[in-house]
Design a protein with these regions (language model features):
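Membrane-embedded helix-loop-helix hairpins and adjacent transmembrane boundary segments
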Residues: 1-495, 501-502, 508-512, 516-525, ...
């Protein structure tokens, strides 16, 4: 990892566009690799394996199909924000909003919330590094957290997005290859996938791991997929890459192939976590985050198992560097006084953010899944105002502020007073945390529309989106795919099918294939216009 980090620092420019956006030069294949490596983080490896340990295979469609379908919103939003980014010289969402609305208040509000939302997600990475270090060497978690933080900060400070993208390519390949090696080892030790699934289904204590009843309600299922759809494009590090894309066609190719990468990334940790319940049936919520390294070390021994655990390090490093760079750009370009010395600001901000994330990872007792869901809910609230600002030229900055404050107020209420949701909604606690996204998005959208109407309707403002006739069919097809993914007709189904997996797993995979086909046709038509 150290050698690759040094190699990645070649031919780097020092201007902001080169440092933060790699000169807007990311082509389709590179964009796909860096988006995937950045998005598939410690949450992917340790959070998803821990969650599947607790709730079983129902977490696979939620993550693999759900994050794969998120590419649709990336494509719809990405083309417009890339254009606005070039138009305004913007490198962050708040900068784009400032360019469109002329409101410094809107810029400051959005940037502040994005930075606050990123801190708990940033803490996931050193938390996971500590897990790997402890599994490999038996020392305290905090040592691994500190060492990995130091390495990531070092090459991010000196390299910018070009260095991050180069390390993403290497780290992504390492993570994916070694995760599949780890899965092969665990499955072989269990006697094969079918044998492992049969053992799970034949025990009263584990049979619920092959079903959804008791693990999800339909509302939680739908809410979680909605959360991914609206939250992921608002991740500062993913938004930054959309701005850095070479063309709309590059974004289209990335969005088309993203579902395949999502399935490849989530199958290993989720299957390992589920199978791990056979060997370690009594882990608590926080302890279940360790199930993947524990299983791999058990079946692979210290050397081979340790090699596979490098996959976790590669995944978390490829996300942490991107988070530091993107969040640093929010602070230096949106929050700090423009008169501050540019290079000093970059370095001090990135170091400060890394220390905040490190501190939260060491002293917080929240699980990796808890930290991730908190950050995702805060991100999702940004989507309506960013989408509106990108598509309309006369959005009022006060409407953006109202939208953000209204939505985040609901998120804060969900965190500190979940009982307030009883009686009219679902208490957003534990597995039901994602349900907060629907009322928070409703509040955000209401704040945007009502405030915009109050200040702008007398000037003839219209909410009418311009949609090409050729876009209607693919949009309708993708909507059908999303609705079909909420397969309530198989909700109580636990009967296993091919490879011992429930049929609703295969159904979700088939829907991702359908999504890919629709996207390929749509992107091809748009590119030929």
């Amino acid at each position: 990892m150290v050698i690759f980090a040094i190699w990645a620092r070649r031919d780097l420019g020092r201007g902001d566009e080169s440092y933060y956006l790699a000169g807007r030069s990311l082509t389709g294949p590179i964009l796909l690799v860096t988006m995937a490596a950045t998005n598939f983080s410690a949450f992917t490896v340790y959070g998803s394996s821990g969650a599947s340990y607790r709730i079983g295979l129902s977490f696979l469609p939620i993550m693999a199909f759900g994050t794969g379908f998120m590419a649709v919103s990336m494509y719809i939003l990405g083309r417009k924000i890339r254009s606005r980014s070039v138009q305004h010289g913007a490198m962050t969402a708040p900068e784009m909003v400032m360019g469109q609305t002329g409101s410094r208040s809107a810029q400051l509000t959005m940037a502040s919330v994005l930075v606050l939302a990123t801190i708990p997600y940033l803490a996931l990475q050193p938390r996971a590094a500590g897990i790997v270090f402890s599994a490999l060497f038996g020392g305290p978690d905090w040592i691994g957290a500190v060492l990995v933080t130091l390495l990531v900060v070092a090459y991010t400070l000196t390299g910018g997005l070009k260095a991050v993208v180069r390390t993403d390519a290497v780290q992504g390949a390492i993570a994916l290859g070694l995760l599949w090696l780890g899965l092969a080892m665990v499955v072989n030790d269990a006697g094969g996938i079918s044998t492992a699934m049969d053992a799970i289904s034949s025990s009263e204590s584990t049979e619920e791991l092959l079903g959804r009843e008791g693990n999800y309600t339909l509302l939680i299922w739908v809410s979680t997929m909605v959360l991914w759809l609206f939250a992921d494009p608002m991740f500062p590090q993913l938004y930054q890459r959309l701005c850095a894309a070479e063309s709309d066609a590059a974004i289209g190719r990335m969005a088309t192939l993203y579902p395949a990468v999502a399935w490849l990334a989530f199958i290993p940790p989720i299957l390992i976590g589920t199978i791990g319940h056979l060997s370690y049936p009594d882990l608590d919520r926080a302890g279940s985050d360790n199930i993947l390294p524990t299983m791999i070390m058990d079946v692979g021994g210290e050397w081979l198992g340790g090699l596979v655990l490098v996959a976790g390090l590669a995944a978390l490093m490829s996300t942490m560097d991107s988070q530091l760079l993107a969040t640093g750009s929010l602070v230096t370009r949106d929050l700090l006084d423009k008169e501050s010395p540019e290079d000093w600001s970059r370095e001090s901000v990135i170091i400060s953010l890394s220390l905040l994330g490190l501190a939260l990872s060491v002293w917080s007792d929240l699980s990796i899944l808890d930290l991730g869901l908190l950050a995702f809910s805060m991100y999702a609230v940004m989507f309506p105002s960013v989408l509106a600002s990108a598509h309309f030229d006369d959005i009022d900055g006060r409407a953006v502020v109202a939208s953000i404050l209204a939505g985040e107020a609901v998120v804060i209420l969900a965190v500190f007073s979940p009982e307030s949701f009883s009686g009219w909604w679902v208490e957003p606690v534990r597995g039901a945390v994602p349900t907060a996204v629907i009322p928070s998005l409703f509040a955000s959208l209401t704040g945007l529309v009502v405030t915009q109407r109050y200040f702008k309707m007398r000037e003839g403002f219209s909410w009418r989106f311009k949609i090409n006739n050729s876009d209607i069919a693919p949009l309708a097809g993708l909507l059908v795919v999303f609705v079909m993914a909420q397969d309530f007709w198989w909700w109580g189904e636990t009967e296993t099918w091919a490879l011992g997996l429930p049929r609703w797993i295969w159904w979700s995979a088939a829907l991702s294939i359908a999504q890919t086909a629709i996207m390929a046709r749509w992107v091809g038509k748009v590119s030929s216009r």
